[in-house]
Regions:
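Nucleotide-sugar donor-binding catalytic core of glycosyltransferases
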Residues: 1-110
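Short, hydrophobic/aromatic alpha-helical segments in well-folded domains
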Residues: 19, 85, 124, 141-142
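Residues in well-ordered alpha-helical elements
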Residues: 56-59, 87, 119, 133, ...
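CheY-like receiver
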Residues: 61, 124-127, 162
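Short, flexible helix/strand-to-coil boundary loops that buttress conserved ligand/catalytic motifs
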Residues: 108, 125, 139
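Conserved acidic donor-binding segment of nucleotide-sugar-dependent glycosyltransferases
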Residues: 112-119, 127-132
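A charged, aromatic-enriched C-terminal amphipathic alpha-helix characteristic of glycosyltransferases
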Residues: 130-163, 167-171
Length: 174
């Protein structure tokens, strides 16, 4: 069964990442794994569980939590690189509250709750708290899409196909 915890996995890099600060200000049951947060959070530093978590431990954490918070670094947004943890969280059936990223919204228009400011972040939290089963159902509907298009195996197969294509097209280079 799902717990009550909101999760954030990521380093601060000395940057006040808004979704984390808003969650702390709102006294949400946030648990953080990442470096650089204790100094930034002051009295809320008890939210920091550790500066690191093994990748092998993340799925169990995702399966036991209520929701995860996500944001993208500016360069990721500039180039529309979707944070890979979103796929991991959704594959584990975990709802995601994320900043707006056009590429992400194109992939998951309904399965992720999006914010672009503090008010929208609060609306996402209200949606989680008031309509959790509906949000969770939208997340669970994504499993076939994730498995078919975004699994490790699918991505590895695509990379091999790209390499093979270029090797064949450029056989004169060999």
């Amino acid at each position: 069964s799902r717990g009550k915890d909101y999760l954030f996995i990521g380093n601060s890099r000395g940057v006040a990442r808004p979704c984390v600060l808003w969650a702390a200000q709102d006294k949400l049951p946030l648990k953080i794994w990442g470096a650089g947060w204790k100094a930034m959070l002051g009295p809320d530093k008890t939210m920091v569980q550790d500066v690191f978590i093994e990748n092998s431990q993340i799925p169990a954490l995702y399966r036991s939590a209520r929701v995860t918070l996500n944001d993208h670094w500016k360069d990721m947004l500039d180039y529309q690189f979707v944070n890979n943890r979103i796929f991991d969280a959704l594959a584990c059936g975990l709802p995601v509250i994320s900043d707006c990223c056009d590429e992400l919204r194109e992939i998951f228009p309904e399965a992720v709750l999006y914010y672009s400011n503090k008010e929208e972040f609060h609306q996402c939290v209200k949606e989680i708290e008031n309509n959790y089963e509906e949000v969770k159902a939208k997340v669970d509907e994504q499993w076939p899409v994730i498995k078919e298009k975004y699994s490790f195996e699918t991505r590895a197969r695509e990379l091999v196909e790209i390499v093979e294509k270029h090797r064949t097209e450029n056989s004169w280079l060999q």
